[in-house]
């Protein structure tokens, strides 16, 4: 190393000496051509740039400047160690940065797994709700005897599954309303159904009701198995067609859990309650008649008879084959009735009559007042003396006493 440094120092000294000798010699002998009369002074170039442009006598002194450039190239040898040291620094900086990033993903993965485990039970609860919806939809076709024969087999299979959840069976009657309601109503009903399920989970109640459901399902399977297929049959006009559609509907329904689990029948009671206000508008006569029909075949079930009244509006919809979507039609009919019969209402008629009378009296009063004023003007009640008196009273404040005051 000391030998190399010495060589570099010697080279630098030689180059500096050459440059020092060349520059004064150039300054003494080399002169730039000057044009006093021309525009030579107007050149925008600086002194350094003019040296390159004006070559003078063409003696080629510029070669010595190239020698200076060689000196610069020699300096690159000394700067070689500098990038090596600089290269080491970013490496050290990058290493500590890489370690924390590696640690964070490991920590993040563990909580994600735990959260996924928590979400799994929630997902399992969600499919149970649609199964209740499907089961609750089709209990209403109790009138046709053919449907009862087809559903007896399904009831026998479901008895095993319903032992734990038999508390909900009592409420299966109101499920008939869901067929006609659109999917929006069914969703709302499912939310309420979940809330009711929690109170029914008490152990003593389930043990008593399970026995009742098993006995009920085999003989009186008419209402419960019907609940599964009826969403498809609700749109069909005749009850005979509903019986034919019963076997096909359970297969089409996406939640397969509906035939297996009958706890959805609790939810059906809530669904029927939701549907009562929506469907009550269009037809009240048919609904009342069919309420009795639904309660009579299901009287064999002890608890079912209590729930039947809320389910009646759904049955009324079934009685009318022409109305496929009663919920939408009921809303439209309710909105149209007030528009058509606004004048027929007693309140509106009374308001119109009273308003007309008051308006007529007010108009008559205005007319009488105008007539009265016109008569006074014609009689000359307004004399010319009155304005004179007014002028006199107006001149009083012009007195000096009042002015000073």
Curated annotation (Swiss-Prot):
Glycans are attached at residues 39, 55, 57, 59, 66, 280, 283, 330. Residues 373-405 are cytoplasmic. Residues 31-59, 134-159, 191-301 are annotated as: Disordered. It comes from Gallus gallus. The record marks 346-347 as: Cleavage of ectodomain. GO terms for biological process: cell differentiation; cell migration; chondrocyte proliferation; growth plate cartilage chondrocyte proliferation; positive regulation of substrate adhesion-dependent cell spreading. One of its GO terms (molecular function) is growth factor binding. PROSITE patterns: SYNDECAN. Residues 1-22 form the signal peptide. This is Syndecan-3. The keyword Zinc-finger does not apply. It is found in: Membrane. Cell surface proteoglycan that may bear both heparan sulfate and chondroitin sulfate. The multiple functional domains provide potential sites for mediating the adhesive cell-matrix interactions and cytoskeletal reorganization involved in limb chondrogenesis. Interaction with other matrix ligands as well as phosphorylation and shedding of the ectodomain might be involved in cell shape changes that occur during chondrogenesis. Furthermore, shedding of the ectodomain might break the adhesive interactions that promoted condensation, thus facilitating the deposition of cartilage matrix molecules. InterPro entries: Neurexin-like (IPR003585), Syndecan (IPR001050), Syndecan/Neurexin_dom (IPR027789), Syndecan_CS (IPR030479). GO terms for cellular component: cell surface; plasma membrane. Residues 38-52 have a biased composition (Acidic residues). Proximal chondrogenic central core of embryonic limb buds where cartilage differentiation is being initiated. O-glycosylated within the Thr/Ser-rich region which could interact with lectin domains on other molecules. Residues 23-347 are extracellular. Residues 202-237 have a biased composition (Polar residues). Disulfide bonds: none annotated. Belongs to the syndecan proteoglycan family. The gene is SDC3. The keyword Coiled coil does not apply.
């Amino acid at each position: 190393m000391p030998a190399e440094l010495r060589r570099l120092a010697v080279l630098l000294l030689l180059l500096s000496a050459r440059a020092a000798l060349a520059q004064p010699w150039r300054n003494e002998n080399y002169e730039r051509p000057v044009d006093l009369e021309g525009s030579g002074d107007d050149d925008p170039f600086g002194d350094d740039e003019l040296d390159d442009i004006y070559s003078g006598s063409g003696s080629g002194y510029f070669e010595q400047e190239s020698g200076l450039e060689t000196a610069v190239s020699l300096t690159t040898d000394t700067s070689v160690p500098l990038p090596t040291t600089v290269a080491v620094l970013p490496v050290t900086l990058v290493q500590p940065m890489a370690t924390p990033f590696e640690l964070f993903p490991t920590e993040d993965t563990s909580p994600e797994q735990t959260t996924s485990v928590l979400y799994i039970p929630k997902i399992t609860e969600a499919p149970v709700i649609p199964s209740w919806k499907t089961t609750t939809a089709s209990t209403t076709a109790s009138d046709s005897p053919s449907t009862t024969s087809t559903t007896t087999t399904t009831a026998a299979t479901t008895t095993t599954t319903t032992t734990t959840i038999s508390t909900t069976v009592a409420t299966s009657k109101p499920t008939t309303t869901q067929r006609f309601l659109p999917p929006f109503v069914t969703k709302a009903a499912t939310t309420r159904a979940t809330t009711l399920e929690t109170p029914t989970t008490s152990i003593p109640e389930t043990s008593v009701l399970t026995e009742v459901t098993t006995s009920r399902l085999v003989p009186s399977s008419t209402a419960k198995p019907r609940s599964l297929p009826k969403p498809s049959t609700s749109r069909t006009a005749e009850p005979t067609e509903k019986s034919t559609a019963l076997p096909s509907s359970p297969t089409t329904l996406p939640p397969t859990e509906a035939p297996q689990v009958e706890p959805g029948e609790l939810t059906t009671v809530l669904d029927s309650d939701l549907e009562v206000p929506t469907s009550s508008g269009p037809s009240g006569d048919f609904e009342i008649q069919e309420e009795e029909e639904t309660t009579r075949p299901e009287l064999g079930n002890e608890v079912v008879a209590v729930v039947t009244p809320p389910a009646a509006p759904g049955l009324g919809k079934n009685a009318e084959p022409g109305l496929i979507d009663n919920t939408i039609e009921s809303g439209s009919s309710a909105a149209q009735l007030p528009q058509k019969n606004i004048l027929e209402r007693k309140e509106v008629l009374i308001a119109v009559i009273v308003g007309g009378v008051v308006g007529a009296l007010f108009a008559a009063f205005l007319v009488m007042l105008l007539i009265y004023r016109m008569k006074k003007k014609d009689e000359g009640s307004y004399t010319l003396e009155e304005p004179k008196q007014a002028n006199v009273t107006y001149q009083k404040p012009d007195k000096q006493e009042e002015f000073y005051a």
